[in-house]
């Protein structure tokens, strides 16, 4: 199985933490091959789609944000036309609400994840080509072959502290001028404009774990 991660950002100064966060949880699975196509929203969507096509992936995955949403849809619609049998799956803050309208408006997208993916994406990869089994995957939203909408709720990581750190993934991007280190997930504030507002429970890593991970980053240089 070949997964193509489409890393579409506003500029090359940015790097998605979602890719290494997910890859780290399945890095030991020899049946899964990961490849990356990186692009910015300022590049030609047709050229980006062509680059994805050259990899001939089974699955195309990406994170959808406010700033890349429009261009991402242009790219993925072209990818589906070039690779009609590929499975396109998305995640990110754009899918925290009702996803029925989005899926009907963008039928080239096979499914979207609502919530946190580190535990449920590995489960889905075991049945990615068996849509009849998707109803068991928490957080997955999709349309079945008859066009019926299925909403499997919100996925939350049961044990935040037990996750394999993103920096353990070979796909972690060390080339940027800064490194992202997630020490807390969720927020106790309730800002109306923020998708993390009011997210409970707030989960934090132990100070000792944070210290060890900072040391790992330091040792990497």
Task: Please state what every model-predicted region is.
Residues 12, 25, 67, 102, ...:
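Tryptophan-centric aromatic hotspots in well-structured domains and transmembrane helices
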Residues 1-20, 24-25:
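A short, flexible N-terminal coil/short beta segment enriched in small residues
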Residues 14-15, 68-71, 160, 167, ...:
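Secondary-structure boundary/capping motif
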Residues 5-11, 39-40, 58-68, 92, ...:
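Core AdoMet radical
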Residues 16-23, 73-76, 211:
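Short amphipathic alpha-helical segment that frequently serves as the phosphate-/nucleotide-binding helix
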Residues 161-221:
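Radical SAM [4Fe-4S] cluster-binding motif and immediate context
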Residues 2, 25, 33-154:
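Glycine-rich beta-alpha loop elements in corrinoid/cobalamin-binding modules
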Residues 1, 137, 142-183:
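N-terminal [4Fe-4S]-dependent radical SAM core
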């Amino acid at each position: 199985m070949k997964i193509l991660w489409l890393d579409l950002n506003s500029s090359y100064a940015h790097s998605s933490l979602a890719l290494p966060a997910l890859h780290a949880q399945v890095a030991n699975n020899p049946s899964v091959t990961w490849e990356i196509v990186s692009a910015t929203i300022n590049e030609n969507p047709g050229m980006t789609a062509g680059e994805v096509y050259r990899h001939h992936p089974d699955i195309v995955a990406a994170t959808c944000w406010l700033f890349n949403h429009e261009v991402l849809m242009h790219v993925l619609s072209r990818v589906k036309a070039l690779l009609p049998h590929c499975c396109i799956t998305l995640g990110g803050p754009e899918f925290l609400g009702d996803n029925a309208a989005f899926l009907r408006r963008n039928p080239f997208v096979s499914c979207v994840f609502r919530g946190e993916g580190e535990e449920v994406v590995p489960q889905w990869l075991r049945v990615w080509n068996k849509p009849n089994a998707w109803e068991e995957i928490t957080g997955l939203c999709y349309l079945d072959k008859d066009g019926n909408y299925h909403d499997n709720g919100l996925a939350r990581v049961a044990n935040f502290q037990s996750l394999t750190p993103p920096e353990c993934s070979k796909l972690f991007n060390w080339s940027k001028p800064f490194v992202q280190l997630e020490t807390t997930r969720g927020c106790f504030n309730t800002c109306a404009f923020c998708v993390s507002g009011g997210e409970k429970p707030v989960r934090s890593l132990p100070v000792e774990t944070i210290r060890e991970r900072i040391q790992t980053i330091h040792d990497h240089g």
